[in-house]
From Swiss-Prot:
Changing K293R: Abolishes sumoylation. 10-fold increased in transactivational activity. GO terms for molecular function: DNA-binding transcription factor activity, RNA polymerase II-specific; identical protein binding; protein phosphatase binding; RNA polymerase II cis-regulatory region sequence-specific DNA binding; sequence-specific double-stranded DNA binding. It comes from Homo sapiens (Human). Residues 245-322 are annotated as: Interactions with DUSP26, MAPK1 and MAPK2. Its main location: nucleus. Changing A19D: In CTRCT5; sporadic; decreased binding to the DNASE2B promoter and decreased DNASE2B expression; impaired RAD51 induction and UVC-induced DNA damage repair. Homotrimer. Exhibits constitutive DNA binding and forms trimers even in the absence of stress. Interacts with ALKBH4, DUSP26, MAPK1, MAPK2, MAPK8 and MAP kinase p38. Gene3D superfamilies: Winged helix-like DNA-binding domain superfamily/Winged helix DNA-binding domain. It comes from the Eukaryota. The modification Phosphoserine is found at S298. This is Heat shock factor protein 4.
Length: 492
């Protein structure tokens, strides 16, 4: 008996074709729809002639919809691509509204190739692409670390913002404090240096140098005055003399008879105790006050007296020498002698328009012209003492040019306690100090220009005018000092 041949392994049956591809194959091969959809001449693609009519007339017969866009999307899902011809690729729209699609496995007459047409499936993640737990944990740790760094950075940023605001507020405060300190320093500088820049015309808080002449080897103590009111009648004349109290005893101390002493006195120093001046009716006597004063004996028993020059706007305070008998003074006042009380003034000075007007003087009250001392004072007052004194240490303020000069003072034996010339206003009558400059040719070289004082005496009787009461003598020309002032220069 013959054995049957072994059965060959059967090939697997054809895979089922998707319904969309079967319907599309039938639709394209149907001759009744060639006017709307057909094969291309090459047979590798198919054409859709009129898309709108195709969507309305053909699609509902094979599909459940009549949407051309859905039909095109399904073709793309199976791998069909739209063929763009040269006509359709231009900018101008072609006359025929048709579209062509093609697929390598969709060919006319080869239906078996439809099995190769597969629907595009989204790519699935393989095992290698999945997250492993350890990787996920590491990633979460890194995210948490980044979040912590971010939080710390934000906290630091907030702190920096707060510090920045605080610093700006401090800067504003410091600017305000700096401006206030700058203004205060400016005011202080103005108060300190303003009077110096303003010049001598401003007498307001400016400390002016004052010169005081006193006899002795050291600077004298402040002048002591007897408490005695001045009569109102005596203040009517620019210069007057008031008798001292009976108990006043003055004398020169032996150790203070060396010569005059010049010391610095502040302008705003308080007035001597006990001195009272009645104010002038015209209010102008408050400027410039020259005092001819006396110093009583010191508690130790040594009497001190001297000439004190304290200029206030070119005015001077003069301390009188020890007293002499009253008879000599009365003889002078009664006119006993070879002079007239008004003679020297009328002979040497031009007649002023005002009773108090005095000829023009220098910046410190010195007259510019020379006058003969013989014509200004009576002979009894023109007897200089034989002794001479040298200026003490305080003369150093006058400059080195005045050191070593000698001065002689006339001994006036007059009992008087206070001689005060009142100058009503600056620029009006002032105390004329004929300077301690060298005499002009033809005059006595041992005799300096006199210090003229208009004196009104009050010796128990009516007040009498006295044109001259004091003369300061200087040594010969080679040893004569110029006027006591920092601006003066020694006479040639």
């Amino acid at each position: 008996m013959q054995e049957a041949p072994a059965a060959l392994p059967t090939e697997p049956g054809p895979s089922p074709v998707p319904a969309f591809l079967g319907k599309l194959w039938a639709l394209v091969g149907d001759p009744g729809t060639d006017h709307l959809i057909r094969w291309s001449p090459s047979g590798t693609s198919f054409l859709v002639s009129d898309q709108s009519r195709f969507a309305k007339e053909v699609l509902p017969q094979y599909f459940k919809h009549s949407n051309m866009a859905s039909f095109v999307r399904q073709l793309n899902m199976y791998g069909f691509r739209k063929v763009v011809s040269i006509e359709q690729g231009g900018l101008l729209r072609p006359e025929r509204d048709h579209v062509e699609f093609q697929h390598p496995s969709f060919v006319r007459g080869r239906e078996q190739l439809l099995e190769r047409v597969r629907r595009k499936v989204p790519a699935l993640r393989g095992d290698d692409g999945r997250w492993r737990p350890e990787d996920l944990g590491r990633l979460l740790g890194e995210v948490q670390a980044l979040r912590g760094v971010q939080e710390s950075t934000e906290a630091r940023l907030r702190e920096l913002r707060q510090q920045n605001e605080i610093l700006w507020r401090e800067v504003v405060t410091l600017r305000q404090s700096h401006g206030q300190q700058h203004r205060v320093i400016g005011k202080l500088i103005q108060c300190l240096f303003g009077p110096l820049q303003a010049g001598p015309s401003n007498a307001g808080g400016k400390r002016k140098l004052s010169l005081m002449l006193d006899e002795g080897s050291s600077c004298p103590t402040p002048a002591k005055f007897n408490t005695c009111p001045l009569p109102g009648a005596l203040l009517q004349d620019p210069y007057f003399i008031q008798s001292p109290l009976p108990e006043t005893n003055l004398g020169l101390s032996p150790h203070r008879a060396r010569g005059p002493i010049i010391s610095d006195i502040p302008e705003d120093s308080p007035s001597p105790e006990g001195t009272r001046l009645s104010p002038s009716s015209d209010g102008r006597r408050e400027k410039g006050l020259a005092l001819l004063k006396e110093e009583p004996a010191s508690p130790g028993g040594d009497g001190e007296a001297g000439l004190a020059l304290a200029p206030n706007e070119c005015d001077f305070c003069v301390t009188a020498p020890p007293p002499l008998p009253v008879a000599v003074v009365q003889a002078i006042l009664e006119g006993k002698g070879s002079f007239s009380p008004e003679g020297p003034r009328n002979a040497q000075q031009p007649e002023p328009g005002d009773p108090r007007e005095i000829p023009d003087r220098g910046p410190l009250g010195l007259e510019s012209g020379d006058r003969s001392p013989e014509s200004l004072l009576p002979p009894m007052l023109l007897q200089p003492p034989q002794e001479s004194v040298e200026p003490a240490g305080p003369l150093d303020v006058l400059g080195p040019s005045l050191q070593g000069r000698e001065w002689t003072l006339m001994d006036l034996d007059m009992e008087l306690s206070l001689m005060q010339p009142l100058v009503p206003e600056r620029g009006e009558p002032e105390l004329a100090v004929k300077g301690l400059n060298s005499p002009s040719p033809g005059k006595d070289p041992t005799l300096g220009a006199p210090l003229l004082l208009d004196v009104q005496a009050a010796l128990g009787g009516p007040a009498l005018g006295l044109p001259g009461a004091l003369t300061i003598y200087s040594t010969p020309e080679s040893r004569t000092a110029s006027y006591l002032g920092p601006e003066a220069s020694p006479s040639p």
